[in-house]
From Swiss-Prot:
<feature type="domain" description="Dicer dsRNA-binding fold">
    <location>
        <begin position="581"/>
        <end position="671"/>
    </location>
</feature>
<dbReference type="GO" id="GO:0030422">
    <property type="term" value="P:siRNA processing"/>
</dbReference>
<feature type="domain" description="RNase III 2">
    <location>
        <begin position="1241"/>
        <end position="1389"/>
    </location>
</feature>
<dbReference type="InterPro" id="IPR036389">
    <property type="entry name" value="RNase_III_sf"/>
</dbReference>
<feature type="site" description="Important for activity">
    <location>
        <position position="1305"/>
    </location>
</feature>
<dbReference type="GO" id="GO:0004525">
    <property type="term" value="F:ribonuclease III activity"/>
</dbReference>
<dbReference type="GO" id="GO:0005737">
    <property type="term" value="C:cytoplasm"/>
</dbReference>
<feature type="binding site">
    <location>
        <position position="1309"/>
    </location>
    <ligand>
        <name>Mg(2+)</name>
    </ligand>
</feature>
<keyword id="KW-0460">Magnesium</keyword>
<keyword id="KW-0694">RNA-binding</keyword>
<keyword id="KW-0540">Nuclease</keyword>
<dbReference type="InterPro" id="IPR014720">
    <property type="entry name" value="dsRBD_dom"/>
</dbReference>
<feature type="region of interest" description="Disordered">
    <location>
        <begin position="1"/>
        <end position="40"/>
    </location>
</feature>
<feature type="domain" description="DRBM 2">
    <location>
        <begin position="1545"/>
        <end position="1629"/>
    </location>
</feature>
<feature type="short sequence motif" description="DECH box">
    <location>
        <begin position="169"/>
        <end position="172"/>
    </location>
</feature>
<dbReference type="InterPro" id="IPR000999">
    <property type="entry name" value="RNase_III_dom"/>
</dbReference>
<dbReference type="Pfam" id="PF00271">
    <property type="entry name" value="Helicase_C"/>
</dbReference>
Amino acid sequence: MADDEAAVLPPPPPLPPPCRPHRQLRPRGSRPTADTTPRTSQLVEVFEAALRGNTIAVLDTGSGKTMVAVMLAREHARRVRAGEAPRRIVVFLAPTVHLVHQQFEVIREYTDLDVMMCSGASRVGEWGADHWKEEVGRNEIVVMTPQILLDALRHAFLTMSAVSLLIFDECHRACGSHPYARIMKEFYFGSQWRPDVFGMTASPVATKGASTLHNCEAHISQLELTLDAKIYIVEDRNELESFSPPTTIVNKYYDAYMVDFDNLKSKLQIFSDEFDSLLVGLQESPSNKFKDTDNILETSRKSLSRYHGKILYSLNDLGPIITSEVVKIHIESVKPLCDSEDCIFSKASLCLHMSYFKEALSLIEEILPQGYGELMKSESGSEELTKRGYISSKVNTLINIFKSFGSSNEVLCLIFVDRIITAKAVERFMRGIVNFSCFSISYLTGGSTSKDALSPAVQRFTLDLFRAGKVNLLFTTDVTEEGVDVPNCSCVIRFDLPRTVCSYVQSRGRARRNNSEFILMIERGNLQQQEHIFRMIQTGYYVKNCALYRHPNALSYDLSIQGMYTYQVQSTGATITADCCVNLIRKYCEKLPKDRYFMPKPSFEVTIEDGLFKCTLTLPRNAAFQSIVGPLSSSSNLSKQLVSLEACKKLHQLGELNDHLVPLTEEPMDTDFTTADEKCISGPGTTKRKELHGTTCVLALSGTWIHDSENITLNTYRIDFLCDQEGENYAGFVLLMEPELDDDVAPSKMDLFLIPNKMVYTTVTPRGKVQLNKKQLGKGKLFQEFFFNGIFGRLFHGSRKSGAQRDFIFKKGHEIQWNTESMYLLLPLRDSSYIQDDLSIHWEAIESCAGAVEQLWSSYQGDENVIPVNCIPQKRRGGQEEIIHLANKSLHCSSIKDSVVLSLHTGRIYTVLDLILDTTAEDSFDEMCKGKASPFTSFVDYYHQKYGIIIQHPEQPLLLLKQSHNAHNLLFSKLKYLDGSTGKPLLMEKEQIHARVPPELLIHLDVTTDILKSFYLLPSVIHRLQSLMLASQLRREIGYNQHIPVTLILEAITTLRCCETFSLERLELLGDSVLKYVVGCDLFLRYPMKHEGQLSDMRSKAVCNATLHKHGIWRSLQGYVRDNAFDPRRWVAPGQISLRPFPCNCGIETAFVPSHRRYIRDDPSFFVGKPCDRGHRWMCSKTISDCVEALVGAYYVGGGIAAALWVMRWFGIDIKCDMKLLQEVKFNASHLCSLSKINDIEELEAKLKYNFSVKGLLLEAITHPSLQELGVDYCYQRLEFLGDSVLDLLLTRHLYATHTDVDPGELTDLRSALVSNENFAQAVVRNNIHSHLQHGSGILLEQITEYVRSNLECQGKESEFLQHTTCKVPKVLGDIMESIAGAVFIDTDFNVDMVWEIFEPLLSPLITPDKLALPPYRELLELCSHIGCFLNSKCTSKGEEVIIEMSLQLRDELLVAQGHDRNKKRAKAKAASRILADLKQQGLSIKQCLSKAKQLDIVTSDLQFDLTSSGTQLSYSDLNDYHILEGLSSVKKEVVLPLKMEKGGPRSALFKLCKILQWPMPEFEFVEQRFRTPIVMDGATTTNFNSFVSTITLHIPDATTITFQGERRTDKKSAQDSASLMMLHKLQELKICICKT
């Protein structure tokens, strides 16, 4: 027989295609679609047949089956869109992930349908019912693998009634237990609504070949019955073949490989046996006598056997040259595993594998000829090597086929092989040795069960290269047989013959190009192979004949629609059958708590009774139940299925499986205000989410008594001030209010901080009651209105310049309305001494003020823009030079100094500093303009022109006056304004601005300057008192019967934004631990059958921010939260008219804000904290959660655990803590058998210095879950859960009480370090507790031993205390510390103090701030923020090893470091450690930057960068002819920057550019100017008296430094924006960036 033999079926001549258009869908979307007009009339026939009924289309590959499916999908969608059919989806099933991707892309290209793709890679297995409903609701067609659909149907996430059309790609698989068959049998036939079915296949027979026509007919009938469809085959294929041309079948024969390598094989076998013995010998060490190491050994031995088998197969079938490539491939795959393995036992076994491979490679290379590679490059090299037996004839034949292709690069050839290793090795051989330089060669393998398989992404990438012609020769397994579209494939070679008819038909169909060839490589003289080929070809004829000519009812079979063993949930319709329950039980066990040393899994034990099988199922200890016995059954496999079915029923009844029969997981929190179309809103309790809330009114300040006509009795509270500097005196005041304050609100003390370095100690003490008559009340009311408006507001509104009528606020007939929510009086006291027994109100000062107002009332005349003339005194007579005539009186010049006066023309209150004896009103006004030309000739001229005032005594000396100023927030410690390194103040007291005014324009007020100075302190004092009253009000609402200090509650509701000397941060930290502790105890007692994982999930849900937010909102806590700094400019006393109103634009008429979607935002631009005049303010949602935690912490500090429980229950947190259940726990533990471990337990008790009353608790606490595999039904996991919260509370409580002056952020770091697994593990090793651990894991023992060794080496090295060592810390060591704590806690009846007595010595020495070591990556990030540099990090992987590369650009040096590890976190830590070491060499460390950080955080708290600059600074003018891009390797092209011109926009854009290019942050400096009058900017008069100019310096590494000065602005941030904008424009000129506004 000739080597080349033509195919049995010659290709018929092609026919022209008919033009029969398919009805199109109405356009719906904007996506263009490709033409779906049927290629041939035959396809139209198939389509119409499918419309008439369920159809199985049998068509060759490439003939258009998928197009028919797309046409059907479009038709079904058209009916739904037209309203002709109810809303249902089309489900397109494909058996592989690759086909799912391919069909998804086809549907997207050829339709405008809304299509979704589902595969295992898309994590569909994690979807719940709601997610499925959402996805199905918004898509018209879903492409998925059949197992996903089967699972969705079983769990009732999807029902058959929701599907209008089922499309089965490669439907010949619908047999046996394949998901295709399961879908039909379990759900299709039992559904009241049955969707249409369309199946596609190239061959309906999936076996090795039908021996008779009858057998073929049986296969077809069975497929039709399963899919409830009829086979449809096109009889006349001529027209189809014009689009899918037939392939020429060519047989290539090769000689059998007769070379004998018995000597080599025997040596390889000896080595294999030898290394197998060495593997067995690994078990002799003590750590390897456990089940897990047995499993590793068994797996390792099987792997070695498989590797050996592959080598022998390659030697027998391919020859020793390719076998050497096989061994090299094995070495390359195992070496990375060996290098990165951290388990000593596994590493040792892998090293033995490597040794075997090296020995095998050495043996093989010994028999290979020298220079065989060069020989292969010669023309006859392969023939020579074949003759000598170094490559098989089969491989040589393949080489000759490739040679026959010539040098054409248009060849696209698929070479099918059976084994992955064959594809890899032959591909390497061809590419590396054979000289086929004109061809690009690669391989493509699949199969998720094989370690050698390529990932789906790599498969798709390789296939795309092949389609594009960038790969010519592609070695592949059966992954490309089914349905993969490679239309330009010119040749298909079956290096290994197809095993089934389907494989034959489908691989032949891959050759789609005209004149393509399908080459079968057949061993010469092998009759078995020839018969196999003949049977497959014969079956093709049988299939065609059966489909065309058989009788419709020729054969009939019974179809088992659904197994009799099922379980259904009536509420959802979820249904499971016995055969799927085993996997469901395994899935349930996978959800149980596990670690590296213990994987919970079910155990089946089958016994035989009277010839029947009965199975006992045992579940892990932490499952809902431990064992169940199934019914008798006819087979062992069925008995496992039935007992699993019974177990699933019981798990569902116990609530472990939900109503969809899915293992129960914690449902996501129910979030308020969220709907399906509002996904942009972040969840409650998050920082990103902003909510609008109101402010709770202080009830103690509410009232209407100021308007009472009768005598009123008020409570009095004396306010005294004592300055820490001599000579600074402040008058005392009295606060009068109707209600009586709590005894810890008054008396109270507070410190007021003044600049520079001045402090005023303030006390508020109750002084009993006082009765005021109507007259006194009126005068006191007038005094308060006069002074607070005169100092902080205005007594006159309107001006001559503005054109508005000048209006006196005290004009007759007008009364200032007092806010009923703020009702109190502040009156001066006569004696300003610090301690005063009696209370003496300074009525003279009060009445003097009233007299001044009366005088203005009586003298006010018609023209309200002119000063009343009768207020001005007569001309001075002779001899009165020492008398100064004021507006209301005349005084001796010696009495005028330090008096308080009121300006008639401005209505402002001043303090007289001195007389300016050498200056009168007739003198030049130029001095007031600081040397500039003045438009006024004199003071007389100035007052006449500006105010219309005629000076009557121009000869009088002017008075030098100190202007009144705005109130300041004096509650914020100015110590934070000190330079951390020098101690010098960073902010200085502003230069005082003085006024020069003629005396006759001033009204003298009979009050002292001490009284006036005290007014500036009162806003801060009253604000603090209001806060204390608010906290006291909240305390009354909570209603605990014991006293909780009001200062604690105030601290708990005060956020950092308030800029106070205290905040909720510390209490929040403590409250978090208290919540975790209380909820943990309650859950532990309440749910004795819940495992640790479930308890942890329940606790997390109970104390998460979303839950706490809900509780806080329920109690209206948001109204009490103090979330903004005290703003004295907006503070008003009762009777004071606000100069800075903030009208409410929130759309709410009440102070309370309802819970509604429109009052929630996640836009970061929303300003948080600033309230409107109704008290509405935007607040971070997390702030409310933080306050709940802080209040719990406050009550715990003030009243212990009982008070904390009270406030938690007040919030609505469900806490029971039934202590009767504790005795049940102890009783159950007492039954644990501890006799065999009594010596071990007593020894451990001695180390703990505590004797357990219930020894079983300690035994349970030291028992690892891995012992469950040996029959132990208890472990430490639940005790670990309890002990975790106990130790967390104890350590947090210790830190809170001990480190009172530590920053809250550092306190959090300390707690994290103290409760870390590393710290607990070190304590366990230090006290030798680990030796008592009961476990059944050799890997665990090995890791503990290695860690103990590493720990002992580091002992005594103080600098390495709690450093992150290279040796991984076994989590188990930390777990047993927590579990023992839980055991002690239970044994002592929940006595936390006794637990602390026992564990404090064990954990000592406790970490202190000076010993705290941050994780390297965290430390590096903080250091980068301090030095103003950006850290760049890139992650790659090499095998199982993760590689982290970090780069940090300093001023003129780029630091680069790498970290390698199997764990990404550890690799990141290693890289960060190397960067830190480099920085330390340059004198940069986090400790050195801490003092500077304090300075920077205060001066420019919104900008985290270094304000100092160094080095030479070049002006931007020097850069005009310099192209910076030439000196910057990092800038490849211009960076496109979005630029917002609003405040902060230019700075953000510049910072983003620096981050992208890894430049250091820019540096800013300020110059401030102060003016006597409001400054004019851009032609408009502003309300500001200060201006700022910012200078920006940007250092570009390895290039230059650019400096710019911005324009003048009224605040620092705007000045920074101006400078940043100029810098951006220059960088754009230099072609570094493109700014887009």
